[in-house]
């Protein structure tokens, strides 16, 4: 009899479909699955597909009212992870209709929702996502993108330079503005609010916005270059966030900033739409990312968070520095840097890219290298990140023995020297130290910076292997 058979049944009967060929419109996910002892990988992979799409733990009579074949996620391929015991990469295909158009929030609620607490799994990590063109086209994406940003700022042929204002908490608005002015006047393109600067008792947001705007207009007038300061619009409510962005627009500044993970994808997407409609660039900080992406066997890899940001919208995003890290990390970081900047990225497992991704007409995002970098790293950073990047030196500017402005001068001189050397055909990987030393001869500021940070190891020799 054709009937409804109650009871608990294996997920793999319905959700493990090795014969399935993914469609162009499917969203594909690569999960690193660590099953509990005794759970076969097919069952674990099928459980992931089920729990992140249409499944529940038992058979329900309402299953008969819909077409599971049309809406279910399918685990279509499983491979063991080399060198790891009891870990598998499970590939899952999700039909297009499972996700609301233009909503990163809804996509994540399904794909990385309840399934991560699932008992049959010891650990679960989302390694990569292939976003189908049909779904990509439902997103606005970055407010402006790389080319429009260069045109707005009138800066071409080199990476952009930034600096996070320190101490990050405790300065008054007036003193904060002074620090901004000194950095911009010395030759930086941007200064940055720290991610934890919102609107605290010692410095309310409106005062900070005013003094920073004054600083950048003064620096612009004196240098003849367009300057920006990332005004952090992150707030406790979406309404307050937009209010801050509106005030920034009224001041006529070029760029605002948002903490996209702590602020949330819904707020971020709203802000990105506002920024495109009102000609503001949007700088994105990734505070909280390590909570999600640090563990190798559980969580979400940063390349997925980076893809999600490109869909939600942002013109800059922090993406690590690569310098002084291991070679493998270098390849993987460059993998998601390409995912941020390029229109079309080929599958390349050696760089951690599990799927070919076509972004069609979504603008690119500038990767921001920030954290523990200084003038000796400049050749490495120029070589690794190329022109389409923002290099941010916080302590590497403000820690200069003579102050902020000379610190900014040192960084700008180092950058211009590296770009010129590269354009003349010199090998930055081999001659990096030499190029910086030569530039020191005609820049006292750079010489002083090099002296301060010379003890900090410059680990770039290994780059020849790339």
UniProtKB/Swiss-Prot annotation:
Binding-site positions, Mg(2+): 192, 194-195
Source species, domain of life: Eukaryota
Pfam family, one: RuBisCO_large_N
Major localization class: plastid
Subcellular location: Plastid, Chloroplast
Biological process (GO), any one: photorespiration
Miscellaneous comment: The basic functional RuBisCO is composed of a large chain homodimer in a 'head-to-tail' conformation. In form I RuBisCO this homodimer is arranged in a barrel-like tetramer with the small subunits forming a tetrameric 'cap' on each end of the 'barrel'.
Job of this protein: RuBisCO catalyzes two reactions: the carboxylation of D-ribulose 1,5-bisphosphate, the primary event in carbon dioxide fixation, as well as the oxidative fragmentation of the pentose substrate in the photorespiration process. Both reactions occur simultaneously and in competition at the same active site.
Family membership: Belongs to the RuBisCO large chain family. Type I subfamily.
Protein name, per record: Ribulose bisphosphate carboxylase large chain
Origin species: Caltha palustris
Gene responsible for this protein: rbcL
């Amino acid at each position: 009899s054709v009937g409804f058979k109650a009871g608990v049944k294996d997920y793999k009967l319905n959700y493990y479909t090795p014969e399935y060929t993914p469609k162009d419109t499917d969203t594909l996910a690569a999960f690193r699955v660590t099953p509990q002892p005794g759970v076969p990988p097919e069952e674990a992979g099928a459980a992931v597909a089920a729990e992140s799409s249409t499944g529940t733990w038992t058979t329900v009579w309402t299953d008969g009212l819909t077409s599971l074949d049309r809406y279910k996620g399918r685990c279509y391929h499983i491979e063991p992870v080399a060198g790891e015991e009891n870990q598998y990469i499970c590939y899952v295909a999700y039909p297009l209709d499972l996700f609301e158009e233009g909503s990163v929030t809804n996509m994540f609620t399904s794909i990385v929702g309840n399934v991560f607490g699932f008992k049959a799994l010891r650990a679960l990590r989302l390694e990569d996502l292939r976003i189908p063109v049909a779904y990509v086209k439902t997103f606005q994406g970055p407010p402006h993108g790389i080319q429009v940003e260069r045109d707005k700022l009138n800066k071409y042929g080199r990476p952009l330079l930034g600096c996070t204002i320190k101490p990050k908490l405790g300065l008054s608005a007036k003193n904060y503005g002074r620090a901004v002015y000194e950095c911009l006047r010395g030759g930086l393109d941007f200064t940055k609010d720290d991610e934890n600067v919102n609107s605290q008792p010692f410095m309310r947001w409106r005062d900070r916005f005013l003094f920073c705007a004054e600083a950048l207009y003064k620096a612009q007038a004196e240098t003849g270059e367009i300057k920006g300061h990332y005004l952090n619009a992150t707030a406790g409510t979406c309404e307050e966030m937009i209010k801050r962005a509106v005030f920034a627009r009224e001041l006529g500044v070029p760029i605002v900033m948002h903490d996209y993970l702590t602020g949330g994808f819904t707020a971020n997407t709203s802000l990105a739409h506002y920024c495109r409609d009102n000609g503001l660039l949007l700088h994105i900080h990734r505070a909280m990312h390590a909570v999600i992406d640090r563990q190798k066997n559980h969580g979400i890899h940063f390349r997925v968070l980076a893809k999600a940001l490109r869909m939600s919208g942002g013109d800059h995003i922090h993406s690590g520095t690569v310098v002084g890290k291991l070679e493998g990390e270098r390849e993987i970081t460059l993998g998601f840097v390409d995912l941020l900047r390029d229109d079309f990225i080929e599958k390349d497992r050696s760089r951690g890219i599990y799927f070919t991704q076509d972004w069609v007409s979504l603008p690119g995002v500038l990767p921001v290298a920030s954290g523990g970098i200084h003038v000796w790293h400049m050749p490495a950073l120029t070589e690794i990140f190329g022109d389409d990047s923002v290099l941010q030196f916080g302590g590497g500017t403000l820690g200069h023995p003579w102050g902020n402005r000379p610190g900014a001068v040192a960084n700008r001189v180092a950058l211009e020297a590296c770009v010129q050397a590269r354009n003349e055909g010199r090998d930055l990987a081999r001659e990096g130290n030499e190029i910086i030393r030569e530039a020191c001869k005609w820049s006292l500021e750079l010489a002083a910076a090099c002296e301060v940070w010379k003890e900090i190891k410059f680990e770039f020799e290994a780059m020849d292997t790339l």
